[in-house]
Amino acid sequence: MNLWTDDNASMMEAFMASADLPAFPWGAASTPPPPPPPPHHHHQQQQQQVLPPPAAAPAAAAFNQDTLQQRLQSIIEGSRETWTYAIFWQSSIDVSTGASLLGWGDGYYKGCDDDKRKQRSSTPAAAAEQEHRKRVLRELNSLIAGAGAAPDEAVEEEVTDTEWFFLVSMTQSFPNGLGLPGQALFAAQPTWIATGLSSAPCDRARQAYTFGLRTMVCLPLATGVLELGSTDVIFQTGDSIPRIRALFNLSAAAASSWPPHPDAASADPSVLWLADAPPMDMKDSISAADISVSKPPPPPPHQIQHFENGSTSTLTENPSPSVHAPTPSQPAAPPQRQQQQQQSSQAQQGPFRRELNFSDFASNGGAAAPPFFKPETGEILNFGNDSSSGRRNPSPAPPAATASLTTAPGSLFSQHTPTLTAAANDAKSNNQKRSMEATSRASNTNNHPAATANEGMLSFSSAPTTRPSTGTGAPAKSESDHSDLEASVREVESSRVVAPPPEAEKRPRKRGRKPANGREEPLNHVEAERQRREKLNQRFYALRAVVPNVSKMDKASLLGDAISYINELRGKLTALETDKETLQSQMESLKKERDARPPAPSGGGGDGGARCHAVEIEAKILGLEAMIRVQCHKRNHPAARLMTALRELDLDVYHASVSVVKDLMIQQVAVKMASRVYSQDQLNAALYTRIAEPGTAAR
C-alpha cells in the first residue's frame, strides 16, 4: 500500500515547513532558553506568561526534543512488552480554522527482527514500492541533516512495512474526536486494541493492520496523546497503563539509565507540561455552585486570567505551602530559578496530594485589587465558616480592599494582586485579634460538633509564609480576612487535637430478667422481634425436616401435616402395645399349663404306655424352615410318633429320611412353618414332649 504517492508533490514540503503543524520541533533542543526579564519589568513579564501562547509556534516553548526522545525511548527499551514504535501526538491549534488538533510531536522507532527476516516479493511492483520508500527516506534524511549530508547518499537497507507506517505517520494530524488518537484525547480514556485492528472504526488502525501491526495503544496525557504499536498481540494487564505512564514521566527507575541534561532544570519546561500530573479545572468564570462571589465591579481587561491544562476535573492540585510574590523591595527571581523552586516544592509534596492550602498568602501592589471570592458555608470549597451557629465573617472585606491568590510566574496558575499594606500597629492589633478569635471559635466548635464535621470536607492546613518586611499600609479589613481564615483553620485543628470527645455515659440497666445470650444490655423491641422471628423460622425449618409428607410449603400446612403425622405415630404405638400385651398373656397361659400338667410315670407299661428311652432331638431353624433330627430306639414305631407330632404342630413336611442302625432309628425331617412360628427351644420342647411320652403322642 502506497500512502505517500507522487500525486501530492507538496506533501514533503508542507510536512517540513508548514506552520499548521507546530508540534514538529526538529531543532528545539538546540534553541537556547530566552534570557530572564529585568526585575523592573516583572509586571509585564508576568502578564505575558498569563496570556495563552501564540498558536503558530507553541511547541518551541513547550517541548525539549532531547527529553521527549528520552521519554519515548525509555518506554520502548524499559517495557516488558515488545513495542515496535512510540509516537507522541502533541495538541496544537490550527491557525486557519482555530480548531484543536493532534500533530506529530516526536517518535521513536525500534523495528522488529521478524519483519526484516521476512521474504520480500520480487515483483516489479514491490521493487518500485521499495525504491519509492527509499527515495522518501533519503529526502527526509537530507532535510534533517541539512547541508552537511551528501546528496548521493543511498539507503541500503529495505524500508519495512512498519518503518514505512512510522514515516507516513509524520504527515498525519487528527482533529479532536477523530481518529484513534483523537478519540482517546476526546474521551480522556486509554484505548487498547489487541485483536480487532482490522475491524476497528478507524482508518489508521486498519492501515496499521495492513502494515503488520497487531496491537495499538493510545494513552491521553496532559498535552497530547502517546501512541504505541507492536507487531505482537499484547493484552492489557492491570499495571500496564501505570507502568507506561511511569516510563514516560521518567521515573526514578527509568531515568537512572539516562545521563542528566546540563540545562534540564532550566531549559526543559516539559517537566511541567509533559508530566501527567493530577488534572485540574481552572476556568475564567467560576460557577456559583462552587464558590459564592460577592458582586464587585468587573476587573480590567488586562487582568483576565488564562489557565491552560490538558484535562479537566475538580480542584485537586495542591499549590506550594507558602505562596510568595515579589514586592518592589524584593527583586523578582529569574524564571528559571522560580521554575526550579516550584519543581522542588511539587516533588516534596507529591503528585497526589488532594489538599488545597489557602491559609497564608501574600500579594504585591501596584494595581487595583481584583474581586475577592468569599465562599459561603455548606458549599464545595468550605473555608471554615460555621453554618450551625449562624455566624459569618465579622469583618467582610469591601471590593476595593480585598486580597486573592498569587503565585510565582511560570506556575500553573497566576494572578495579579495588590500588596497587603499594613502598618506595624495594625499588624500587632490584628495578631491579637486573630488569637482571640481562634480561642473563641475553638470553644464554640466544641459545643457544635456538627459544624466541625461540615467544615472537614477539605483540609486547609496552616503553613509558614514569608511576608514582606517593608511596604505600604493596607486596610485592616483585608488582614482581618486572613486572620479569620487562619482562626477557622486553627479552630478545626484545636477541636480535633485538644478537645477529646466525652465518654459516652452508660445507661442504667433495667430491672428484670437477665438478657439472653449473655448480652449486657437488653435489646429494644425491634431487635427482640427480629430475633424472635429468626428463632421461629429455624424451628419451622427443623419441623419441615422431620415430617415425611409435606403437602404445601406454608407454615399452616406444615403444622397440619405435623399434627397428622403425630396422630399416626400415636395410633401405631397403641397397636404395638396391644400386641405386646396379647403375647404376654399367651406366654403366661402356656407357663401355667405346663406347671399344672401331672408328672410322667417312672415305670414302663405295655405297648402304648412304654416310654421311649434314650431319645435325642436336635432342631435347627433357618427363617421359616426347620431341620429336625431325631435319634431313638426303634421300638414302638418312633417314625409314626414323629409324623403325628409334626401334624399336631402344624408343620409341613417337604423332605424326610429314616435309617435304622441295629436298634437305633435315625430320622431327619425338613419342615416349613406355615401358620405358626416356633423358636428353636419351643420346637425342641414340643417334639420331646410328643415323642418321648407315648401317651401324649397317641392323643
UniProtKB/Swiss-Prot annotation:
Record domain bHLH: where: 520-569
CDD domains recorded: bHLH_AtAIB_like
GO molecular function, one term: DNA-binding transcription factor activity
Record's compositionally biased regions (Polar residues): 306-321, 413-449, 459-472
Residue segments, region Helix-loop-helix motif: 534-569
Region Basic motif: start-end pairs: 520-533
A Gene Ontology biological process term: regulation of DNA-templated transcription
Primary subcellular site in the record, as a coarse category: nucleus
Matches recorded under Pfam families: bHLH-MYC_N, bHLH-TF_ACT-like_plant, HLH
Keyword set, alphabetical order: Activator, DNA-binding, Jasmonic acid signaling pathway, Nucleus, Transcription, Transcription regulation
Basic residues compositional bias, start-end: 507-516
Sequence segments annotated as region (JAZ-interaction domain): 93-158
Record's subunit section: Interacts with TIFY3/JAZ1.
Function: Transcriptional activator involved in jasmonate (JA) signaling pathway during spikelet development. Binds to the G2 region G-box (5'-CACGTG-3') of the MADS1 promoter and thus directly regulates the expression of MADS1. Its function in MADS1 activation is abolished by TIFY3/JAZ1 which directly target MYC2 during spikelet development.
Protein's recorded name: Transcription factor MYC2
Organism: Oryza sativa subsp. japonica (Rice)
